[in-house]
């Protein structure tokens, strides 16, 4: 389930806002220019679906947001817990950085944690299946896919080289807990 927690950047242990309600999440994020939406597939997406099948299932929303925001390229990324480069991939964006274009991701499956640092506040957004998040360019943030990453996401780009992280060199990301998604209870 999606979740937004907001902290003062000086207090990483106690959020002053905590919600799993999609409308409340969208409302709070809108205040800082971030888009949060829920999408639904126009056709079933089976595990192991090809990128083309994934994009076909969400074609109307992909076309809408691409037209609204001027995206030129869309792709599908899939990360599994058994990926031999998972630790390297996780570490790549764990520190505070920004991009020179909007970072827009739609979670087809799985989950990840976007953490935004805006105006002395830290916004921790757990994105799950059916969530779209659009982080404006130059927004300070970090992303954690967890120790056993599992997600399929549609990514949107305006420039082929725009999705380059520009790191701030601050230690703030290390002050906040890393992502550890809740695991469903085991069947007995």
UniProtKB/Swiss-Prot annotation:
Binding of Ni(2+), residues: 97, 99, 103, 141
An example Gene Ontology molecular-function term: acireductone dioxygenase (Ni2+-requiring) activity
Annotated positions binding Fe(2+): 97, 99, 103, 141
Top enzyme category: oxidoreductase
Iron recorded as keyword: yes
Obligatory cofactor(s): Fe(2+); Ni(2+)
Marked site (May play a role in metal incorporation in vivo) residue numbers: 96
Alphabetical list of Pfam families matching this protein: ARD (PF03079)
Annotated region described as Disordered, given as residue ranges: 1-20
Gene3D superfamilies, per database record: Jelly Rolls
InterPro entries: ARD, ARD_bac, RmlC-like_jellyroll, RmlC_Cupin_sf
UniProt keyword annotation of Metal-binding present: yes
Functional pathway: Amino-acid biosynthesis; L-methionine biosynthesis via salvage pathway; L-methionine from S-methyl-5-thio-alpha-D-ribose 1-phosphate: step 5/6
Site (Important to generate the dianion): 105
Alphabetized CDD domains for the sequence: cupin_ARD
Reaction catalyzed: 1,2-dihydroxy-5-(methylsulfanyl)pent-1-en-3-one + O2 = 3-(methylsulfanyl)propanoate + CO + formate + 2 H(+); 1,2-dihydroxy-5-(methylsulfanyl)pent-1-en-3-one + O2 = 4-methylsulfanyl-2-oxobutanoate + formate + 2 H(+)
Disulfide bonds: none
Function: Catalyzes 2 different reactions between oxygen and the acireductone 1,2-dihydroxy-3-keto-5-methylthiopentene (DHK-MTPene) depending upon the metal bound in the active site. Fe-containing acireductone dioxygenase (Fe-ARD) produces formate and 2-keto-4-methylthiobutyrate (KMTB), the alpha-ketoacid precursor of methionine in the methionine recycle pathway. Ni-containing acireductone dioxygenase (Ni-ARD) produces methylthiopropionate, carbon monoxide and formate, and does not lie on the methionine recycle pathway.
Family to which this protein belongs: Belongs to the acireductone dioxygenase (ARD) family.
Subunit structure: Monomer.
UniProt name for this protein: Acireductone dioxygenase
């Amino acid at each position: 389930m999606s979740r937004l927690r907001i902290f003062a950047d000086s207090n990483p242990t106690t959020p002053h806002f905590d919600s799993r309600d999609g409308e409340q999440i969208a409302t709070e994020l809108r205040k800082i220019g971030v888009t949060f939406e829920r999408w639904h597939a126009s056709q079933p997406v089976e595990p192991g679906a090809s990128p083309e099948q994934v994009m076909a299932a969400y074609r109307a929303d992909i076309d809408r947001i691409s037209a609204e925001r001027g995206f030129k390229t869309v792709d599908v990324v899939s990360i599994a817990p058994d990926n031999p480069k998972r630790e390297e991939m996780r570490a790549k964006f764990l520190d505070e950085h920004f991009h020179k274009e909007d970072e827009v991701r739609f979670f087809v499956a799985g989950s990840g944690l976007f953490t935004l640092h805006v105006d002395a506040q830290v916004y921790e957004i757990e994105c799950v299946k059916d969530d779209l998040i659009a982080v404006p360019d130059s927004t300070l943030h970090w992303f954690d896919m967890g120790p056993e990453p599992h997600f399929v996401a549609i990514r949107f780009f305006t420039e082929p080289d725009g999705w380059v992280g520009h790191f701030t060199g601050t230690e703030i990301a290390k002050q906040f807990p890393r992502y550890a998604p809740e695991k469903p209870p085991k069947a007995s």
